[in-house]
Amino acid sequence: MESLATKLAPRDTEIRAWEVASTFEARHILCTTQGRGQNAAQYIESNLEVHIGCWFIDQYPYHKAVDFHSEHTTTKVRSRLKLYCSADPEEQKVELAILRLLTHGEAELSRDMLQLMVQRLTIGGRLVASVDNVRDRWLHDQMRELFPKVTVHTFADAIVYSAVKQNELKKVRNFQCEFAFRDREQLIYAISRPGVFSHRHIDPGARQLIDAIDIGPKTRVIDIGCGAGTVALALATRDATTYVHAVDGNARAVQCTELGAARNQLTNIVTELNSRGTKATKGSFDLAVANPPYFADFRIAEHFINTAKEALKPGGQLLLVTKQPQWYEEYLPDRWDDVDIWPSKKYHLVAGVRT
């Protein structure tokens, strides 16, 4: 039978982490993946008594993993492999935790995830962490802060560290941040966490977007890719009759927006975790706002725009911010009415009306 690895090859550093992890005994395992969780499924195939939870923060790769295993993994394996997308790993204690990190990943997110993995371990449980830098020192230093003894496993394409949890952490760092910003003399508080866009401060692009928006009473707004919720919080604060639907594919972004709404005592924000669009009623919004990311050859921007078009009423307005207006100049005029693009400090604002 064709192996899961040949159907979709996992990352080398992830393979190395599982090679080391397979030398330890465990019935309950927590892992992350940069792929589809193929290594976890393969491990279960040869260890049918084990239960593995594979944690995703972002819903897009989570859906990819679910689709992959629905097609390629047996029912017996799927019954012991739990894929889930959430802001934090489940509270259940495990004997083994496996984490793959990237050399150029977000340092604070890596520290946060390492700490969370240690917290989920039983006393005597092991953490296995890998990195794609064979000259790594940073991850080694982080591991030594968490464990009294760290074992180094060296490979040609990766370094893997393993360590045994001997005690609960004496000091638990709080990586969550509260920051404040003003909108029309109103002080607003936002909450952010590692892994959320523009952690610890309001994004300058979001600031340009907020300043450009003028809404009236009872306006229905959808904020696509809400991040920490700064735009949603600002608009909801202006008028209690405004309804804001904030959607993002990142579980932590949705959590932060909810925390921000609670912090500002706002009851007119509804959140949705969704990387595929929105489940909100089609054609029910007056305004769609977005601050699309620049990577993925504008595929995400196109997805945001298509989501906006489905959500807006005929005549509803799209308003987004970008540093790269050329693509929008080419893409929007054939699909939207009254397209207008103008500079705003280091950014450009893009507007259009749904046909």
Residue ranges and their predicted role:
Residues 124-132, 315-322:
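Conserved beta-strand signature within the Rossmann-like core of class I S-adenosyl-L-methionine
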Residues 87-99, 277-288:
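A short acidic, Gly/Pro-enriched loop at the edge of an enzyme's catalytic core
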Residues 3-77, 204-290:
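Conserved SAM/SAH cofactor-binding pocket of Class I
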Residues 141, 145-186, 196, 324-330, ...:
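Class I S-adenosyl-L-methionine
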Residues 96-107, 224-231, 285-297:
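Conserved proline-anchored active-site loop of SAM-dependent methyltransferases
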